[in-house]
Every structure is written in structure tokens, then in C-alpha cells.
Amino acid sequence: QEYNGISKKIRYQTDALRQCGADVRTCHYEVGNDGSRKWMIDEDVLADLGKGIPAKIKKRLSFAPILQYVRREGIQCVYIRSYHNANPFTIHFVRMLKKQGVRVLLEIPTYPYDHEYSSGMEKVQLYTDKLFRHAFCRYVDFIVTFSSDDRIFGRPTIRISNGIDFARIPLRSPRHGTSKELHLIGVAEIHFWHGFDRLLKGLGAYYGNNPEYKVY
């Protein structure tokens, strides 16, 4: 989904890697307007999983089409963006990648992440992840993180910064003066980790000093 913030970040990363000379293919899961579920490689269908509950189950259990593609194309490195879904099936997937001699990098966008789960279903997913994540990471060469941690789940890290592609999002041309006031706008899905509460708390502290400069 091009409007999705996560999808945009992935696009920025793949574009940056291509600019560095890497041959990058993006494997992702797609749900069509007709309810069909597919594994995709860029714009091409890798595997049609069908529709309904059987397709949902296949998505979580069967990674054979991806493994076959990696072997057929001679892929040397697989970069996985973590969905906190370590389980016996994803462990089997990364173990088979290692058997093929593939280097595996796992990006964990937010770490630690245990506190991010609040609903009942999310806690079940987190419990499963806690049970299996160390076993999963045994087959991971490096964990990519935005944090300052040297090691995560026993694996060495590669520390990067979370940025944007200015070629896709140009700097805004100023149209209004900011000498008297500043208007802020939040453009995102509103989840607690986006920090809107911290912004409001900061504004409250700011206005507690009766400032002349107004921020809205």
C-alpha cells in the first residue's frame, strides 16, 4: 500500500540499496480487491494462495515458494522486516535459508517492543514470539536496529537511522511567516508509540509559562 508509512520506508530502503549497486527484489504479501491472497516479488505473483481461511493459514505456515525462489535466483542475502512473529514455521523458514548458504538480516524497527502490545490477541502473539524469538534469531546473522543496542536476542546488531527519501518527499516551500505563531499537524495513524501524548504534555508545559509565541 503506497500510502502506508511502513511500505514507504521499505521503498526508501530498497531504493537506497539499489543506488549502492545492489540487486534488490521486494517480496511481500498482498490481498487483492477480490479477497485473493498472494506472495509477490515486486509486481509479479510468486504464489497465489487462494481465498478465505485456507489462504490465511497458508500465509502463516508455508514459505516454500519463497525458499524455491531464493534457490532458483541464487539470492545471497535475505533482509526481513520483523513482524514479531517468531514461531516454529518462521524458524523453519530461516533455518532453510541458512542451509542454502543465505545471509539473513532481521530488522526490528522498535526495540524493545514488549510494551507495545495491549489487546488480548496482541498479547497472545507476543507470548508466542517470546517463546520462539531466541530460537529464531539463532539463524539470523545480524539484527538491524534504530536503537543503540550492540546485541539483541544474542545476535550482533547493525545500527542505522530511521530516515526518509527527500527525492520522494521534497522540502516544503515556506508560504507563511512563523514570526508570531506556529501551526503543527500530525500526519499518521494515531498509535500510542507515535508520541502525540508527549507532544500535548510538552505544549502544556510550554503554555504554563505564558509564552508570547503561540504554538497550535
Whereabouts are the PLM-identified features?
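A short, glycine/small-residue-rich beta-strand->loop->alpha-helix junction that serves as a flexible
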Residues: 1-11, 82-87, 191-194
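Membrane-proximal helix-turn-helix segments that form the acceptor-binding/catalytic region
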Residues: 64, 88, 92-100, 110-114, ...
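A short, charged, and often flexible helix/loop element on the N-terminal side
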Residues: 29-65, 80, 120-124
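Short N-terminal targeting/anchoring amphipathic segment
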Residues: 67-88, 101-105
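Carbohydrate-associated surface elements
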Residues: 149, 163
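Acceptor-binding helix/loop patch of EC 2.4 sugar-transfer enzymes
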Residues: 49, 105-133, 165-167, 171, ...
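Conserved donor-binding/catalytic core segment of Leloir-type glycosyltransferases
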Residues: 175-194, 200-203, 216
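N-terminal subdomain of nucleotide-sugar transferases
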Residues: 1-33, 73, 142, 198, ...
